[in-house]
Amino acid sequence: MWGLTVLLLPVVSFALYPEEILDTQWELWKKTYRKQYNSKGDEISRRLIWEKNLKHISIHNLEASLGVHTYELAMNHLGDMTSEEVVQKMTGLKVPASRSRSNDTLYIPDWEGRAPDSVDYRKKGYVTPVKNQGQCGSCWAFSSVGALEGQLKKKTGKLLNLSPQNLVDCVSENDGCGGGYMTNAFQYVQKNRGIDSEDAYPYVGQDENCMYNPTGKAAKCRGYREIPEGNEKALKRAVARVGPISVAIDASLTSFQFYRKGVYYDENCNSDNLNHAVLAVGYGIQKGNKHWIIKNSWGENWGNKGYILMARNKNNACGIANLASFPKM
């Protein structure tokens, strides 16, 4: 019976959306997200992608209602994009080919005492509102800024929006909207003796000339530390003891693109294919499923108001503990 039910899911899903309902939903979706297309042909091709994504979402959620998945999906502003396009235009992690970890930057966890069962830095006032990087490969800048903001709050008691555009334009070791790496950003802030606030250096979502101005400086750092590679226990300790941590993940799957709620775990997520930088702002457990609380930079229309709960202690799912780091202040 179970096998028959699963086989019937695509048929049931397709039957849920006759053509006239699809037409209505398409028009509503375009209006909701203010979508306009250059030509009729462009709109037709985008609608086909949207319909394919809608079908994927419907089938997944039917399976979730049967207990197959621990999370649900929903249509969002990325509905007319393929997962390949999302990775190309809206991620941006670029790991240096010559990257090497040294004892000078390695974070050695303090294992004394027990780490809290759950931590949420949003409730402690360490986390600024969710941002939207747009179609610029600047995830690394938003991840870095988020970690810096958390440490600034911890050290000074003040929560300020720092400038990802400052990093996009000025970190010469990275490639701006073409991609970058978080520790390069921390090194820049250290050598530059500061990073501007968002108010002083607003985000524009494209590469510009470096316009850093010391009068707008809002934070600085003394270097960075890296979590032992692939060690989720060390990452948990770092989150609990340090604050929000910059992490890298595989965000290439359609399931990630349309995540809505629940604890995200997709066995197809590749821990060796790290393409997106995000911010770990806590951890916990939901309905028996351990998770990380992750802040993304795709706006509040994505996920659960811009956040996703990602599986914790499930063989380093999506590679979340492979390239974790934080700044020292």
Swiss-Prot record:
Enzyme Commission number, as recorded: 3.4.22.38
Could you tell me which SMART domains the record lists for this protein? Answer: Inhibitor_I29, Pept_C1
Q: Propeptide positions, renumbered to this chain?
A: 16-114
The listed locations are: Lysosome; Secreted; Apical cell membrane
Q: Name one GO molecular function term.
A: cysteine-type endopeptidase activity
Does Kinase show up as a keyword for this record?
Answer: no
Q: What is this protein called?
A: Cathepsin K
Provide the taxonomic classification.
Eukaryota, Metazoa, Chordata, Craniata, Vertebrata
The protein's gene is named CTSK
